[in-house]
């Protein structure tokens, strides 16, 4: 058994030597200050060989022994394991010059996607539109969930409000309202309309009956009004004559009246004329020449009536 164990240990040492050779190959890529010494592994193996083992031939004692590598004391630090001192930036003078110089960093070159951040592509716009549509749909669903009324319910409320407003207006127009419900308001309005139609028909019948006598009545009233408004008086005394005229006015009536009096041989001594609503003339005249004795007061009156445009109707 001891011979087998020694053979196994030799095989392990050979394997470690092969591994150490691999480490030497790796050291070629590492700086000289950081070389790995493969001899440390050989020293560890040599010390492992020098460990005294019990001479017992039992396999259980061999297995129960702890592995030798785990119980090795820590090796003192050797110059081979010491790492080289770290170099600072101040060991190189050109780095210090760059730090203390007024060196401005190079301009930052942004990619085209970051330079044109304000330019939105159509795909981004479409995605935003889809997002906005989704948000609006969510808002609508949230409103419905919160208990807000639907469009049909709001339309029905507006229709009922208009109907109630019209019923209240109809109720204010109709003078007789029996009850305040809708059926009574509509029934009272219909009855009131029938009553108004009956009154209209009755007035039309009365107008037709009086239509034949309307023309005659208008003539009579006009004649009576003319007779009441016309006034022609002539008061003749020895030498003086007093004239009083009142009639509807018309253009040129003053001039024609004065010329008529001069034709009859009367000269106006004093006269008062008013044309505010009707033509009114009050004059005092005296006779001129011998022809005045030939004209009577009645002839003077008829001449003034004809001059006013009434002929001989208002004698």
Curated annotation (Swiss-Prot):
* Keyword Transcription regulation among record annotations: yes
According to the UniProt entry, its GO molecular function terms are: DNA binding; DNA-binding transcription factor activity; protein dimerization activity
Write down the superkingdom of origin.
Eukaryota
Give the subcellular location. Answer: Nucleus
Domain (bHLH) spans: 147-196
SUPFAM superfamilies listed in its UniProt record:
HLH, helix-loop-helix DNA-binding domain
**GO aspect biological process, one term:** regulation of DNA-templated transcription
**Gene Ontology cellular component?**
nucleus
Chief place where the protein resides = nucleus
For bias type Pro residues, the affected ranges are 65-77
Arranged from A to Z, the UniProt key words for this protein are:
DNA-binding, Nucleus, Transcription, Transcription regulation
Can you tell me which residues the record assigns to a coiled coil? Answer: none
Q: Where is this region: Disordered?
A: 56-83
Provide the free-text tissue specificity comment from this protein's UniProt record: Expressed constitutively in leaves and flowers.
Q: How does it assemble?
A: Homodimer.
Mind telling me which PANTHER family this protein's record contains?
Answer: TRANSCRIPTION FACTOR BHLH61-RELATED, TRANSCRIPTION FACTOR SCREAM2-RELATED
Q: What is this protein called?
A: Transcription factor bHLH61
């Amino acid at each position: 058994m001891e011979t087998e164990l020694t053979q196994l240990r030799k095989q392990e040492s050979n394997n470690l030597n092969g591994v150490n050779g691999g480490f030497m190959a790796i050291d070629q890529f590492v700086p000289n200050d950081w070389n790995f010494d493969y001899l440390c592994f050989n020293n560890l193996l040599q010390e492992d060989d020098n460990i005294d083992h019990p001479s017992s031939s039992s396999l259980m004692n061999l297995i129960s022994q702890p592995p030798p590598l785990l119980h090795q004391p820590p090796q003192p630090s050797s110059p081979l394991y010491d790492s080289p001192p770290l170099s600072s930036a101040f060991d190189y003078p050109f780095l210090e010059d760059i730090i203390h110089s007024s060196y401005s960093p190079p301009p930052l070159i942004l990619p085209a996607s970051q330079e044109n951040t304000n330019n939105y592509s159509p795909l981004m716009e479409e995605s935003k539109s889809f997002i906005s549509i989704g948000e609006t749909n969510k808002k609508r669903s949230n409103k419905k969930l919160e208990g807000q009324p639907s469009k049909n319910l709001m339309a029905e409320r507006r229709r009922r409000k208009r109907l109630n407003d019209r019923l209240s207006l109809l109720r204010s127009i109709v003078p007789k309202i029996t009850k305040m419900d809708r059926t009574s308001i509509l029934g009272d309005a219909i009855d009131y309309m029938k009553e108004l139609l009956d009154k209209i028909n009755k007035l039309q019948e009365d107008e037709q009956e009086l239509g034949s006598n309307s023309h005659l009545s208008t003539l009579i009233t006009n004649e009576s009004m003319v007779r009441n408004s016309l006034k022609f008086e002539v008061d003749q005394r020895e030498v003086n004559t007093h004239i009083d005229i009142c009639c509807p006015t018309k253009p040129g009536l003053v001039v024609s009246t004065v010329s008529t009096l001069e034709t009859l041989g009367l000269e106006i001594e004093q006269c008062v004329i008013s044309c505010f609503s009707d033509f009114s003339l009050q004059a005092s005249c005296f006779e001129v020449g011998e022809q005045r004795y030939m004209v009577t007061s009645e002839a003077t009156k008829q001449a003034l009536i004809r001059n006013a445009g009434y002929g001989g109707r208002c004698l």
